[in-house]
């Protein structure tokens, strides 16, 4: 067997797959440093070496500015600095990123390299600017709260049904939280010490009208029901990230409270509440109104109406207080919010409700004055509003059961606070216009949508649609104020016409001509109001419809089966917003009919009056504004660098900040009583003292003998102190009894009479005895007193 090389099984065997893989991995391992060292030449976007890097702005030394020339300069400069040119930075011409080749280096070596690079770049004539790149901390703009009930706040962020919420998270991500705005809840009080409200509480905007002190803390009651105001306040401004309960829609705003519903309420108290601290409070949230029983016709009385008007004129430095009111919860009683004077007012923002499925809840009311709707609770199978609650009595500080239009109005108030943060100079009419322009129409089988002449869709069930925080805030950011409020009031139109039963009807007309509107300049409508006086045996059987010149119909007075009042209407004002943006000129028709079964007595339209409110805007102006707002919905204007100038507000005199508290009042009453007591006591003491002096006098009325000297008194050393001042007898035989009231001389001090000069006593005698002197024998001095 010939000699040969001994076989080594492991080496002589054919290379299998595992062996090849090991060789490939070894090769890659050896190539990694080389690859990483050259990776920087691929461009700055993929750079991730972790070492120092510099941004450098170069200009061509040859003056041509060509990109190829600049690229060559950048390569040479980077090499001179011991760096690698990673390429141009984005689309910025002449800007390059220089990076240090990868490799572990001690900290001292890195610092030496940094100094060397800085020296090279600073001394090169082609370098216009350079800067070492630092790591920047950036966070994703997403909203995360640790409040335990925030995931259940579907109305803020509906994860179960995306889109069925108020669309507010994008606004929060841009740091719009209501900062700088104060919302006041006019209700039964606000528990401001609870941790969800305390950090945002505004004591300077608060007051208790029920107890007449500055603290609106709710009082426990038998029904455990005075939590209403606290719940509304939590919806607006509950503090986030405090690991407690929930989050408010405008959690950066201030929240105040006016306690007025926990006791008897008068017209004057309402008036005070509507204007209380109206240079501090921007928005008044009012989740209350007349009884929702389907038979009440009521609203603010004379003082309340005046306060609402004064608030929109002088409140908020002249931009106008924003009054947000709930439309009412009388739907199950077939009630209608046109019979609610607060919802019917042109000075308020009337807000209705929809449930989480976007449908009209069973309790919601309809009316022609409805401006918009937002979310609230529905039937028992649907979720209600999660918000802060009081922790008094049976309260736990948090609730998942807030519902009704009472829950919808505070959400609207919070969204308006977001609007005022980005545009503080919005007027009360600007807010109404933005709601009309941005509310979104949606389908509901109960809603009857009609598009008016100006292109706005409205339904009696949902107003102009659902409030959308994103649309409201973006529109507010670029909004310029509407022109002045123009109005037209017709004469009182006396009719005295019978109202027939259905299907017949009474129709009355009034034409508004161009000449009628010349004085005010009114062109397009906002609110239209009709004031009627009607007698009818059953008020709830009446149906009133108003037709604007365009033909747009408003059901301003809906029949109500539970309203059997026999007095009809006495100067009651109905209003509608359904003709918003339409032309004001033309013929208005009021159509009334009796839909009841009673035929024993006919109703009479005594008189009516038409009032138009609007502006000098034309139809073209409205269309231009619509296009402008739609262009802003991308959010391109919603950043701090863009801001339209705001006109300065009016200098409204501040309110007197001093308040008499009950304790102060009690103290003043006690001090007053004490003062009266001592005054009476002192007067009684003086009176008794004078009577005592008078009883001790011995002066008689009649002839008065004025001796020059009492010899007996002189001898006894008592001078004249024991001698009567006036006597018809000798002083030594003076009688001690008094026969009449004392005279002026009776009350003279004895030490004055003991002096040698008797002119005083003689003069006093003349004062006491003003009658003429009688001629008497020499040596006697007598007078007839």
UniProtKB/Swiss-Prot annotation:
- Looking at the record, the residues that make up the P/Homo B domain are 481-618
Q: Which InterPro entries match?
A: Galactose-bd-like_sf (IPR008979), Kexin/furin (IPR034182), P_dom (IPR002884), Peptidase_S8/S53_dom (IPR000209), Peptidase_S8/S53_dom_sf (IPR036852), Peptidase_S8_His-AS (IPR022398), Peptidase_S8_Ser-AS (IPR023828), Peptidase_S8_subtilisin-rel (IPR015500)
How does it get modified after it is made? Answer: Cysteine residues in the cytoplasmic tail are probably palmitoylated. N-glycosylated.
Q: Which family does the UniProt entry place this protein in?
A: Belongs to the peptidase S8 family.
PROSITE patterns per UniProt: P_HOMO_B, SUBTILASE, SUBTILASE_HIS, SUBTILASE_SER
A single Gene Ontology CC term? Golgi membrane
Q: In which tissues is it expressed?
A: Expressed in spleen, thymus, prostate, testis, ovary, small intestine, colon and peripheral blood leukocyte.
- Topological domains on the Extracellular side lie at 142-667
One Gene Ontology BP term is: peptide hormone processing
Query: Topology in the membrane?
Result: Single-pass type I membrane protein
UniProt-annotated catalytic positions: 187, 228, 406
Q: Which residues form the propeptide?
A: 38-141
Which residues constitute the signal peptide according to the record?
1-37
Cofactor or coenzyme needed: Ca(2+)
Q: Where is the site labelled Cleavage? A: 141-142
Where in this protein does the record put region Disordered?
Answer: 197-219, 700-751
What is the name listed in the Swiss-Prot or TrEMBL entry for this protein? Proprotein convertase subtilisin/kexin type 7
The entry's function note states: Serine endoprotease that processes various proproteins by cleavage at paired basic amino acids, recognizing the RXXX[KR]R consensus motif. Likely functions in the constitutive secretory pathway.
Q: Which UniProt keywords apply?
A: Cleavage on pair of basic residues, Glycoprotein, Golgi apparatus, Hydrolase, Lipoprotein, Membrane, Palmitate, Protease, Serine protease, Signal, Transmembrane, Transmembrane helix, Zymogen
Chain ranges sitting on the Cytoplasmic side read 689-785
Specify the enzyme's EC class, one word.
hydrolase
User: What species was this sequence derived from?
Assistant: Homo sapiens
Domain of life, per the record? Answer: Eukaryota
Please report the stretch or stretches of sequence annotated as the Peptidase S8 domain: 153-473
Task: Give the transmembrane region(s).
Answer: 668-688
Grouped into one coarse class, the protein's main location is: Golgi
């Amino acid at each position: 067997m010939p000699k040969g090389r001994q076989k080594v099984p492991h080496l002589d065997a054919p290379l299998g797959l595992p062996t090849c893989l090991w060789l490939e991995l070894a090769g890659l391992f050896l190539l990694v440093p080389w690859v990483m060292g050259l990776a920087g030449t691929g461009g700055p976007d993929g750079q991730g070496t972790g070492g120092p890097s510099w941004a450098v702005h170069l200009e061509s030394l040859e003056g041509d500015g060509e990109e190829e020339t600049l690229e060559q300069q950048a390569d040479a400069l980077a090499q001179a600095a011991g760096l690698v040119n990673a390429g141009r930075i984005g689309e910025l011409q002449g800007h390059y990123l220089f990076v240090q080749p990868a490799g572990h280096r001690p900290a001292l070596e890195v610092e030496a390299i940094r100094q060397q690079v800085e020296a090279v770049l600073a001394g090169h004539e082609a370098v216009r600017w350079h800067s070492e790149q630092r790591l920047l901390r950036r966070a994703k703009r997403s909203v995360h709260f640790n409040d335990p009930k925030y995931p259940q706040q579907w109305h803020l962020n509906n994860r179960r049904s995306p889109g069925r919420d108020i669309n507010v998270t994008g606004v929060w991500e841009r740091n719009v939280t209501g900062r700088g705005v104060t919302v006041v809840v006019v209700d039964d009080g606000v528990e401001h010490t609870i941790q969800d409200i305390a950090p945002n509480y505004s004591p300077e905007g608060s007051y208790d009208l029920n107890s007449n002190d500055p603290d609106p803390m709710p009082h426990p009651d038998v029904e455990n029901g005075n939590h209403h105001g606290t719940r509304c306040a939590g919806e607006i401004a509950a503090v986030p990230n405090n690991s407690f309960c929930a989050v408010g829609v405008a959690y950066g705003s201030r929240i105040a409270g006016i306690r007025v519903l926990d006791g008897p309420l008068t017209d004057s108290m309402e008036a005070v509440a509507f204007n209380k601290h109206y240079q501090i409070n921007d928005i008044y949230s009012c989740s209350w109104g007349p009884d929702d029983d389907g038979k009440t016709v009521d609203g603010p009385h004379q003082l309340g109406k005046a306060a609402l008007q004064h608030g929109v004129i002088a409140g908020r430095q002249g931009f106008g207080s924003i009054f947000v009111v709930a439309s009412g919860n009388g739907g199950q009683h077939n009630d209608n919010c046109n019979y609610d004077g607060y919802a019917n007012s042109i000075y308020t923002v009337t807000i209705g409700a929809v449930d989480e499925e976007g449908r009209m809840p069973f309790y919601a009311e309809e009316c022609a004055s409805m401006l918009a709707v937002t979310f609230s609770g529905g039937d028992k199978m649907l979720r209600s509003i999660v918000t802060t609650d009081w922790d008094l009595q049976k309260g736990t500080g948090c609730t998942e059961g807030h519902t009704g239009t009472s829950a919808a109005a505070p959400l609207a108030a919070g969204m308006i606070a977001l609007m005022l943060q980005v545009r503080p100079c919005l007027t009360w009419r600007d807010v109404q216009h933005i709601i009309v322009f941005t509310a979104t129409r949606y389908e509901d089988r109960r809603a009857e949508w009609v598009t008016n002449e100006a292109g706005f869709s409205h339904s009696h069930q949902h107003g102009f649609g659902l409030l959308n925080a994103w649309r409201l805030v973006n529109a507010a950011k670029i909004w310029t104020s509407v022109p002045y409020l123009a109005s037209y009031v017709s004469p009182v139109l006396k009719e005295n016409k019978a109202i027939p039963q259905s299907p017949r009807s009474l129709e009355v007309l009034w034409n508004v001509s161009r000449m009628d509107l010349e004085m005010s300049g009114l062109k397009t409508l906002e609110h239209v109001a009709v004031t009627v006086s009607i007698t009818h045996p059953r008020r709830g059987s009446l149906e009133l419809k108003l037709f604007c010149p365009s033909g747009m119909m408003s059901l301003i007075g809906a029949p109500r089966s539970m309203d059997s009042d026999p007095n009809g209407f006495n100067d009651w004002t109905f209003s509608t917003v359904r003709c918003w943006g339409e032309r004001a000129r033309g013929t208005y028709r009021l159509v009334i009919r009796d839909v009841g079964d009673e035929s024993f007595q006919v109703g009479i339209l005594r008189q009516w009056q038409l009032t138009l409110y609007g502006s000098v805007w034309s139809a073209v102006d409205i269309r231009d504004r619509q296009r402008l707002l739609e262009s802003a919905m991308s959010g391109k204007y919603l950043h701090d660098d863009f801001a339209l100038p705001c006109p300065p507000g009016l200098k409204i005199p501040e309110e007197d900040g001093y308040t008499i508290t009950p304790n102060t009042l009690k103290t003043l009453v006690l001090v007053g009583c004490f003062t009266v007591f001592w005054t009476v006591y002192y007067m009684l003491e003086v009176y008794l003292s004078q009577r005592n002096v008078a009883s001790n006098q011995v002066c008689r009325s009649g002839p008065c003998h004025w001796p020059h000297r009492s010899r007996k008194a002189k001898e006894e050393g008592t001078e004249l102190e024991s001698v009567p001042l006036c006597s018809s007898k000798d002083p030594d035989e003076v009688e001690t009894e008094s026969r009449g009231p004392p005279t002026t001389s009776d009350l003279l001090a004895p030490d004055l009479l003991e002096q040698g000069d008797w002119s005083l006593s003689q003069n006093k005698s003349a004062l006491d005895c003003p009658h003429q002197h009688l001629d008497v024998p020499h040596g006697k001095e007598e007078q007839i007193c």
